[in-house]
Regions:
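Gly/Ser-rich helix-loop-strand patches that form or flank binding pockets
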Residues: 76, 80-93, 98
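Short, well-ordered beta-strand core segments
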Residues: 65, 88, 177-178
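Gly/Ser/Thr-rich active-site loops/lids in small-molecule metabolic enzymes
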Residues: 170-203
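Catalytic core of DAGKc-family lipid kinases
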Residues: 95-175
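ATP/NTP phosphate-donor binding region
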Residues: 1-64, 105-119, 130-141
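N-terminal glycine-rich "phosphate-gripper" loop used for MgATP/nucleotide binding
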Residues: 67-71, 79-80
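Short glycine/serine/threonine-rich phosphate/pyrophosphate-binding segments
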Residues: 12-13, 72-77, 185-191
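Redox-cofactor binding/interface segments in oxidoreductases and associated redox assembly factors
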Residues: 3, 67, 179
Length: 203
């Protein structure tokens, strides 16, 4: 089980090690980024038996990633785990924690996961690629929430053409375009007074 958080923040590091110590009580193998090794070793709550790995190897070897923080931490993990098709469990350390499943007061629920008593919610993601005019791929990534096309800091409308499977859908002038998954559409729908999509709906 990989544990991911910002170990530079004292409270988050303490929370992560509390989770690690709980899981070690069930003989789980705990993985943490090698980048955070010094901060973990210096923490008084460190009890040993944590494996420190390069970040890519950590995601490759983990059967489950536990992300402690706010929605941003979960979104970052989702981007890295997309091509690996492995589950993420969010534990909320932020304010709202829309995507987190647990609070720190609910750590006893982790025993159910160890016992195999859980279900996995599968969410649609966006496969993003930026291609230049000559067909060269400039950027590739994944997103659990949304992809935004904008003109940056320039206050000027841009000409947009939207295609779906090589078929032109529409042309318009605007300051940008937001392509959102059901998971990422919630805030946009609420701000527009619209209905909220079930995040498990397929794109």
């Amino acid at each position: 089980i990989a544990i991911v958080t910002n170990f530079n923040i004292f409270d988050k590091a303490n929370a992560a090690l509390k989770v690690a110590n709980y899981l070690l009580g069930y003989d789980c193998k705990i993985l943490v980024s090698q980048y955070s090794k010094d901060r973990v070793l210096a923490n008084k709550n460190y009890n040993g038996n944590i494996y420190f790995l390069p970040i890519e190897r950590l995601y490759d070897e983990a059967d489950l990633v536990i992300a402690l923080g706010g929605d941003g931490t979960i979104l970052d993990c989702a981007k890295k785990m997309a091509k690996r098709d492995k589950p993420i469990l969010g534990i909320n350390l932020g304010h709202l924690g829309y995507m987190a499943e647990l609070e720190m007061s609910e750590l006893d629920s982790l025993s159910k996961i160890i016992e195999g008593n859980f279900t996995i919610d599968r969410r649609s993601m966006i496969d993003i690629e930026i291609v230049s005019k000559d067909g060269t791929s400039k950027f590739k990534s994944y997103a659990l929430n949304d992809a935004v096309i904008t003109n940056g800091s320039v206050s000027k409308l841009i000409n947009l053409e939207l295609y779906a499977e090589d078929n032109l859908v529409t042309k318009y002038r605007a300051d940008g375009l937001i392509i959102s998954t059901p998971t990422g559409s919630t805030a946009y729908a609420m701000s527009a007074g619209g209905s909220i999509s079930d995040p498990k709906v397929q794109c």
